[in-house]
Every structure is written in C-alpha cells, then in structure tokens.
C-alpha cells in the first residue's frame, strides 16, 4: 500500500483529504455516519466574532454540474463554537482540526483567531478573506493584495498556530494576492473558494437565490481550481491546499500534481455524505494504477 501521509504546515496528516468548511458542519454530525478519524482533518463551519443568522431563503440553487449557495456565514459565533461545538467534536475526533474564520473588519478576524488560538484541538486557522469589508465599501478583502496582507499580518500577531489564507477566485490576478499573503507571514494558502454565480427563474423572472447572487461550486469549477492552484504553487514557497470541484481520488491526484499539499472536498459532501471517506479508501488503488508510491512525492509534479 502506498504512503498517503503529507505534512501540512508542520503537522502530519494521515492522508491529504479535508472536507471543506461549510459542507461538513462541526464534524460530529458526520460521525454518526462513519469514523471521521479516517480523514486527514476537516475544516469546520466558518466562524465569526458574533452570531450570524445568515441570508434569507432560498439560499441554495441547483445548477448544471454544480450548485449556487448564499448561506451568509450562518454560525453561532466564536464563543458558542468554543463552549458548545468543540466539546462535542472532541468526543469523536482525535486529530487537530482546521478552524475556518471569517470577519467583516481586520479587528473581527484578529479577535476570532485570538480566541481560537487557545483551543488545543485547533491545529490550523484557515482565514477566509472572501468576505465583504464593511469598512471598505463592501468589497471583498480577498480582491486586494494589500487588504489580504493586512488581515494576514493582524492574525499572525495574535496566534502561534499555522495560518492558511483562503483565497477567492473572483479576481484578475490571484498570484499577486497569494504572494502578498506569503510576504505578510502566511504559513499556507488555500484555494479556490466559490465563484460568483446566478440563476434566474423563467416563470417569475426573479433570481432563484434571495441574495440574487451566490457562490458557484461543484465539478464545473474543477479545471479553474487546478489552473489557479498550479499558478499559485509555482509562485509561493508555502504549502497550498487545493479545492474546487473535487469529487474523486483521481481529482485529488490531479490537484496534488498541480501543486496542492492537501485537498479539500466541498460540494461533493452535499451530494454524497460518504464521499471523503470513499476517496480516502480509493486512493491506494488509484495510486497503484498510476505507480505512485507516496503522495508527498507527487506534489507539484506536473511538468
């Protein structure tokens, strides 16, 4: 059997499979279906400083080869995540977990990361800079190298845990943003978040999503994700976590060849709740098929 282990920012993973934030809850919900310790780790639901009720419904729409969501970062806030959600997780998951953090100001991000820094089970902070900047006209932090770097630097000041910055694909030059985050002290980069999409109901001529637009994810964005992972991994010296349309062991191999150290699986969890477990179990056979002895050896192996 091939070696599935990888090292992500100094922490060893049994395998590179990571259910993506927003598609796996706080983990314990899936523990009723299978042993989630089979996973490398997972990124729990996006956490903000204060509780958020999310966007009005409908906030999910089916699309060709994917889906659109505009959930709006619904979560109980960092204090309840620490006091209620993480204790439940500790009973069923015995590995470091990735904490996904969102915010609407630099201060929001720093506060939430500082609170999570004290949690022993949190191994990495995945900082989602795709959120709108309430003090910057609503523009996403992740569309500006300077703004993304500012958040990175602020978070690095309040934590000793590895900081992975999650980037938006809705930009013209994702490489410059990744490099700005690296220069500001980021320990890793994860990409891509969802692409901006929209559907319209032909009967009432209104957007299907109450928020009008939302994040498009699923198999259709996989080639875009592979391209961006390849570009970023060739431009930075820190680890890259690849995601976007991944749904099979073959997709994982392709993403790693593009330069990903670990791979997140998002929308596919909503189609098949066992998909991440199945990918972990399928990897040895796929590795044998392509004569791969160790996954860590193929990272960035695309010629």
Regions found by a protein language model. Give the residues of each.
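N-terminal capping/small domains of soluble enzymes
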Residues: 1-97, 102-104
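Short acidic/polar active-site loop segments enriched in Thr and Asp
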Residues: 39-40, 45, 95, 122-125, ...
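Short gly/pro/ser/thr-enriched loop/turn and capping motifs at secondary-structure boundaries
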Residues: 48-53, 132-134, 196-199, 270-272
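C-terminal helical cap(s) of enzyme catalytic domains, especially alpha/beta-barrels
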Residues: 55-64, 200-214, 256, 268-293
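Alpha/beta enzyme core
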Residues: 83, 106-241, 250-265
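Short donor-sugar binding/catalytic loops of nucleotide-sugar-dependent glycosyltransferases
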Residues: 246
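A short, charged, Gly/Pro-tolerant segment at domain boundaries
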Residues: 296-303
